[in-house]
């Protein structure tokens, strides 16, 4: 049975998969994002940035599997992602400080931005790569305008420092999101529609992933 390996330490991505009936093997990737972004050059468009980062993360995890977890690498699909928010001509990752998160929120309030999530997928069989692909999903996010006191309370929670763009849809930040256009799970960090398409192209079905990663319909009925 095919294992799904999530190459990310993101609690949001893990929850998306668990809620969708997948209990993945989690192996966090360790990629120097600044080096990858610098290599792309200043003219790289947002979709390329997140796509290349996701592909690099998936490749790093796949290399780890074929070197140290060959039983898993005998039949698995590696999924790694990278998310960034594009708004007002800027591409934003995780804020480095509370002050940076505050500045981001002041620029986002009452506006719309695009949440880009790159998805890197690698299929391993018999410890060899038989398929690899990387694509980007885009969701438009409409931000509300939190009051000064609400914004400070949100910043004090620390949540904004853990996520791209300094906000969440499924956490405390959801209070300040007026709506989304596109797939909501993409905003959390992993687009289920895009992932379904990518795994189908490498010869897998959702049912096969349920069967190989305890948590699907049959498991939940027990």
Swiss-Prot record:
Nucleoside triphosphate pyrophosphatase. May have a dual role in cell division arrest and in preventing the incorporation of modified nucleotides into cellular nucleic acids. Disulfide bonds: none annotated. It catalyses: a ribonucleoside 5'-triphosphate + H2O = a ribonucleoside 5'-phosphate + diphosphate + H(+); a 2'-deoxyribonucleoside 5'-triphosphate + H2O = a 2'-deoxyribonucleoside 5'-phosphate + diphosphate + H(+). It comes from the Bacteria. This is Nucleoside triphosphate pyrophosphatase. Its cofactor is a divalent metal cation. It is an enzyme of class 3 (hydrolase). One of its GO terms (cellular component) is cytoplasm. Signal peptide: none annotated. It is found in: Cytoplasm. The keyword Cytoplasm applies. GO terms for biological process: nucleotide metabolic process. InterPro entries: ITPase-like_fam (IPR029001), Maf-like (IPR003697). GO terms for molecular function: nucleoside triphosphate diphosphatase activity.
């Amino acid at each position: 049975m095919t294992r799904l390996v999530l190459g990310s330490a993101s609690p949001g991505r893990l929850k998306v998969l668990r809620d969708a009936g997948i209990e993945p093997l989690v192996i966090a990737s360790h990629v120097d994002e600044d080096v990858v972004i610098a290599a792309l050059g200043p003219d790289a468009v947002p979709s390329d940035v997140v796509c290349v980062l996701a592909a690099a993360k998936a490749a790093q995890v796949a290399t780890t599997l074929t070197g140290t977890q060959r039983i898993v690498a005998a039949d698995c699909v590696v999924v790694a992602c990278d998310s960034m928010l594009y708004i007002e001509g800027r591409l934003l990752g995780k804020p480095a400080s509370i002050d940076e998160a505050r500045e981001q929120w002041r620029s986002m309030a009452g506006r719309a931005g695009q949440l880009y999530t790159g998805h890197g997928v690698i299929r391993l069989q018999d410890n060899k790569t038989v398929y690899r692909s990387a694509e980007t999903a885009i969701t438009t996010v409409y931000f509300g305008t939190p009051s000064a006191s609400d914004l400070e309370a949100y910043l004090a929670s620390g949540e904004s420092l853990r996520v791209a763009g300094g906000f969440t849809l499924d956490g405390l930040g959801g209070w300040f999101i007026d709506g989304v256009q596109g797939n909501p799970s993409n905003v959390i960090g992993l687009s289920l529609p895009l992932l379904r398409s990518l795994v189908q192209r490498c010869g897998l079905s959702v049912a096969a992933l349920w069967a190989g990663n305890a948590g699907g319909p049959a498991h939940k009925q027990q």
